[in-house]
Every structure is written in C-alpha cells, then in structure tokens.
Amino acid sequence: MSEARRDSTSSLQRKKPPWLKLDIPSAAPATAEEPSFLQPLRRQVFLRSVSMPAETAHISSPHYELRRPVLQRQTSITQTIRRGAADWFGVSKESDSTQKWQRKSIRHCSQRYGKLKPQVLRELDLPSQDNVSLTSTETPPPLYVGPCQLGMQKIIDPLARGRAFRVADDTAEGLSAPHTPVTPGAASLCSFSSSRSGFHRLPRRRKRESVAKMSFRAAAALMKGRSVRDGTLRRAQRRSFTPASFLEEDTTDFPDELDTSFFAREGILHEELSTYPDEVFESPSEAALKDWEKAPEQADLTGGALDRSELERSHLMLPLERGWRKQKEGAAAQQPKVRLRQEVVSTAGPRRGQRIAVPVRKLFAREKRPYGLGMVGRLTNRTYRKRIDSFVKRQIEDMDDHRPFFTYWLTFVHSLVTILAVCIYGIAPVGFSQHETVDSVLRNRGVYENVKYVQQENFWIGPSSEALIHLGAKFSPCMRQDPQVHSFIRAAREREKHSACCVRNDRSGCVQTSEEECSSTLAVWVKWPVHPSAPELAGHKRQFGSVCHQDPRVCDEPSSEDPHEWPEDITRWPICTKNSAGNHTNHPHMDCVITGRPCCIGTKGRCEITSREYCDFMRGYFHEEATLCSQVHCMDDVCGLLPFLNPEVPDQFYRLWLSLFLHAGILHCLVSICFQMTVLRDLEKLAGWHRIAIIYLLSGVTGNLASAIFLPYRAEVGPAGSQFGILACLFVELFQSWQILARPWRAFFKLLAVVLFLFTFGLLPWIDNFAHISGFISGLFLSFAFLPYISFGKFDLYRKRCQIIVFQVVFLGLLAGLVVLFYVYPVRCEWCEFLTCIPFTDKFCEKYELDAQLH
C-alpha cells in the first residue's frame, strides 16, 4: 500500500512544472493568544480553496454554539398597513426601499432631462478601466491569518478583477468577515481587495428581459423543434434583483454547480457569456465577439502543464469588469494571446447558433432608465450635475425597472376597439368642415321631397359622432338629465298633446300632425271632442286626441278598463300591441293606412313622426311599434349601451372612463399608440404599472368630467386628459430632480414648449382642450402623491410625506368640485367653445349650441 502511494507521488512530482513550488505549512494548534471566537470564523473563511473547484461545504457548528432562535413579536395589522403604505408611497424609513426608489429616479432623470451635474456623474460612474494591473487579480492577505497560514502564496483569480462588494459586513463583536461571492467556477479572496472594490459601490442591476425578447426566444425554439422549457432552464439562475448574500444564496440554491471552471471550450464560451453576463461581468462587446470568432483555432491545452509566463499573459484575454477589453496592438505583436482551456462538466450538450443568438440578445437589451433622464431627457440633452451626494447616488442605483404591462395592455385594447369600431360603423366623410347630402325622399305626406342631411366630417378617418356616442363617447345628455335637452323634449310632448290624426280625403293614408300641418282642403283633422268619433272618459268626452291607429275602445292589450283606464293626456298612453277589431271600426283614424311613425333623429333626443325612408336617410332610429313620440325614449336610443334605470333620467356616468378606450379614428389611435410606447412606457418602467394606471385613469376621468361641464353637447373620445396627466408626470419628475440637473431651466422650457404646442394643436376640431387642461392639473396633483422621488435629507423626507397627503386632499377637492358642477349646479359657458376650437370658417367647427344640431 505504501509502495503504491509512493508511485503515485512520484508520478505527480514528474508532472509538476519546474517553476511551481508548494509550501504547505504544517498544522499547528491554536495559540493561547488567539481569541477563541475567531476560530470558527477562520475555519469558515479558509475551509476550502478559493481558486480551485470545490464541493459545497456545510459547516456544522458544535453543540455549544447552538443558540435558541430569537423570539420576535408578531407585527400588528396596523403596523403592517402603515409599513406597506409607506413603502408604496416611497416614504418608508427602510433604507433599502428608499434607496431603491431614489436610485431608479436618478437613472430615469439622466435619460430624460439632460445632463446631470458633474459631481453626480463622478459618483455614479465607475473608475476608469485603463489602469488595470495584474495585482488587482491577486489574493490579498486574509483578514486574520494564523501562524499556520503565513506561508501561503497568492493565487491569481482573473475573474475576480473589478468585482465590487455586494453586501455590507456582518459584524460580530467588532470584527467583520467578508462574504465571498461564489463565481461559476470558484471563489477568491481577490473579490475583497480589488482596485475596483468598495463597500460604497453597488453594482448596476440587470434589466429584466423584455416581453419581445422572451417572445422571440420562444418563437426561435419552436421553429427549431425544441421545447420552450429547454430554453428557459438555462436561464433559471438569472435574477432581476441583487440577492442579500451571494455566498449563502449560491450555496443553498446551486449546490451542484461548484464543480466547474472559469474557462471553457470555444463552443461553450458563448453559452457562458450569455448565461452570466450580469452576475459575473457585463455583456461582452460586439468588437470582442468578432475578434473571438475570427481568431484561428489553436492547440488544445486541456490537461497539459501550465507555463507561468503563459498563465500571466492569459489573463489579458479574460473578461474584465465591464465587457471584454482588447489588448493594445503593440503588446499584441510582442506577446501572442493564448487561450487557456480546461475540462468542464456540463449536463447540456453543445448549443448551435450562438453567433446569431448573441447579437440578437444585444439587440433587445437596453440600459436602465435613469431617473429624470428618460426618452424625453435624451431628446432634450439633459445631464446630471458634476457632483451629487452619495446618498442620492445610491438612491438612483437602487431603482429597478418595471415591466410596462399596463402600456402593452392599453395599446392592445385601443387597437382592438378602434378596428372593431371602424369595421362595424364604417368611416365618416374625411375633412374639417361639414358634409351635406341632398336627396329626394318620400316623407309622411305621401310625396317626394328634397331633404338635406348635414354631417360633421372626421379628419381622424373614423366613425361619425353619432356612432361614437353609441359606442360610449363622453356626452353629457347621456350622463345626466340635461336641462336644455329635457326642456326641449317636454316642449315637443306638449305640442304632441294637442295633435290629432290627419286623414287624407283620397284615403291614401293618415299621419299624426298638428292642425297647422294638416291641409283643410285635402285632409280631415280628426280632433276630439269636436269630431263625433270622440270616446268618453268618466262620462265626459275626451279632450285630447285622436291618435292614428290607436284607440282605447278597440285595444285589448293593454286594455282601457276601470280602474286602469287610459288617461286623458295622449302623451301618457301606452303602446297598443293588440286590437280587438281590424280595419273596419267605423273610426276614420283607425281604418286609414298610417304613413308615419316615430323616428329619433340627431343626438339631442329629437323625435319626428315620419316615413321609414326619411328616417333611414337621416340616420335615425325608426319605431315601427309606436304611434306617438311620447311612447319612445330617443335619448335611450341615441346613447345606447346599458338602458337607463329611469327612461326619463340618463345615468350613464361610466362614460367618464369608458371613453378613454375609444378613438375618433385610425390616425387618432396611431397617435395614442406612439405616445404610449414612448412616454407612457418609459414612465411605467420607473414607477410601475399600478401607479401609472392610477394617474392615467384618474387624470382621464377628471379631464372628461371638466369637458362634460363646459362642452356638454360635444361627443369626445380618446385619452386626451390621461395623456396630459402623463405629461404632468414629466414636470413633477423634473421638479423632483431639480437639484441634480446641470441645466434644469432648459429642460423646463423645453417641456413647456411641448405642452404649449399640444395645447395649440387642441384648437382643431375633435380635440378637447378642456380635457387637456383638467387632465394636466389632476395629473400634476396625482404625480406629486404617487410618483417616486429623490429625498435630500431627513427634512426633505418629512416634507414629502406632507406633500403626499396635501396633494391627495387637493385632488379629491378638485374632483368633488367638478362633480358638484356637473350634477348639482350645471353651468353654461358661451365662449368656452373658442378655447377648444377656433372657427376659421363658418363650417370649420361643429356647432355646440343645441338648436344648431336640430335638423
């Protein structure tokens, strides 16, 4: 046995490089001077090699080190609610949540509002990578080294270069033990002394995979005949957050992944780069990948002896902290690059198509959105100041990007609803004026007449205003009992109360008209009680009537019997569904052929007894079953959607938010989609879908409510108020990051110019400036309450809490005031139409007065 051991030892000595010297110190008992509490710490730190693969080591504590778990008091419901509300509004006392909000805000600001102050840039940017030395890859002396470890040599760990501290110290009685991050191959103490390391520097967090990227990967897997799950298994290790401790997490979650190496074969290198681009080092640059693919195949060095000079030169080909850094051309000519290869145990086979997959990943990858410097900030060249406090800088770095779920859902709904509306209701005449159609139509008098139909043109390439009202547009007469519309309907019913059936002498037909409209020479106006056919009611002849094809004496359903006799007022008569006699009643108003029935025309509840041909030409709603206009409810027909609870009182208040998902046409929808995929999507990445959804919907509802007050007879659709509420978020974000911007006034005036331009654009027809103004004001209040912010000290933190409460109360007051003006004290503004549409011509703007819409 001893002979075999000597043979194996001699074979190992022959394979040992001549320059390699191993000095293994002998084990020595712990000295008396060494503190006893440091022994477990030292065993834990130096239990395994920090440069060679090792199995997961589980340290078993002695029985005297076992401690009872600390008993904690259960958090009360009140404290839980308070803590959750503080975290949601971004004013919690927890440093982690506060830094998370504020770092994301700074990152967003740097992309949107221009250049930052120089001090911010110096504290946000990492140190220069030009001065990288080999000493940064060497392991420093450990925190505590006993006599037995004083002879240990330094071990080179190339991947440890630039690895910053990811967690703070775990202090125990005044001494700290650093947590070594477990890399894909091994761990190294170089992680704690690199020239780029520091407790004050937190790593940039990786952006979550976009929906488009995941969809592209799934489609590629299906085209190749692979399962979608196979492609996602290799990415199960990737996280969208920084774990509290890399050592504890990797040891617990991935116990079988420590038997790997830093270096792999060329076929697996791209897989390693695509699997660990964010947790070990940044994604490789495109130029470096091209150099790697163009490099000639070299001899395989697997299992061979390693030369010291080659080992020291090979670190130049290894990934640095941010991507791959190429060696200078002069140095490359003197020292050829040598790839270091080593055997890797991999459960997955070699993957093909990596030369296409890596550029595709780089195509979909995007940097995080700095607070205050989003898309608009890039367009306006905003930058941070040169110097920013480190506390503010940490707040910027801690902010993560959210997935814009609300933006994608909203865009899908807008597109789908617009397509369905255009397909079902068609496209109105395109233009800015009014479109007139003239035709010869048979009317209720039995003769053809030339009639004209006037329709407002729609330059958005979409349905007409009547169709949009039927779909759910903002329209005050459908949301409340409008005083003018109600008085107009009552006046029409009063005229109908004194009408009677006009029977033509040639027996060509009859129609319900007034005495002025019935010819005394060509027809007979059957008016009760003058006409002998008048029935009796309670022993007296009826004073109002007659009605063509309706009489209480011959109607069976509903019958006019005591105590349910039909009233004296004919406008209160029900619709007769069944008559007891046919056309031979010996009553002239019952035996004639009726030529006109009620037709609801227009959008203001106007009813006219006319022929079906004329009703269809005027795009009205013809009622074949009724004989009087009082028997139909035209506003219910015009508004559509759900029927009113009381047919006389419109109550479709849900139009305030339903109209946010409608558009006036295809162009209108495209404009909204462009806005949502740029500004709204950018802001949702910063604040999350729940905050943006609240601001978007409440701003739109407030804008529509103000528009319904000042422009009650105008059908409006689209998220105009919501979009201006989102624009108000940009102003609030600018105000919150004012102290860190290099030129905040320039960014402010640029934003102001954009808003003024959009407000001027709102002077065109079909664009509501009242919704713009109210949506912007409400969005301003809501943004101060719900958007994330950057705090500049404890006093500023308390000020933000007061600010949240104050602006929520102000918004609720604004909303309550608008509700009172709409339902309780309605107002009428004569000049308000000039604020939303300037009549350059007589027919440029649609008339807002009630009488102008009556045909």
Swiss-Prot record:
**Where is this chain's protein located in or outside the cell?**
Endoplasmic reticulum membrane; Golgi apparatus membrane
Q: How does it sit in the membrane?
A: Multi-pass membrane protein
State the coiled-coil residue ranges. none
What GO molecular-function term can you cite, just one? growth factor binding
Identify the residue ranges that face the Lumenal compartment according to the record: 433-655, 713-714, 768-772, 825-855
| Residues in compartment: Cytoplasmic | 1-411, 677-691, 736-746, 794-803
Q: Give the modified residues of type Phosphoserine.
A: 76, 176, 390
| SUPFAM superfamilies found in the cross-reference section | Rhomboid-like
Q: One biological-process term from Gene Ontology?
A: regulation of epidermal growth factor receptor signaling pathway
What does the record give as the function of this protein?
Regulates ADAM17 protease, a sheddase of the epidermal growth factor (EGF) receptor ligands and TNF, thereby plays a role in sleep, cell survival, proliferation, migration and inflammation. Does not exhibit any protease activity on its own.
The entry assigns this protein to a family as follows:
Belongs to the peptidase S54 family.
Which PANTHER family does this entry report, sorted A to Z?
INACTIVE RHOMBOID PROTEIN, INACTIVE RHOMBOID PROTEIN 1
Q: What is this protein called?
A: Inactive rhomboid protein 1
Query: Per the UniProt entry, what species is this protein from, by scientific name?
Result: Callithrix jacchus
What gene is it encoded by? Answer: RHBDF1
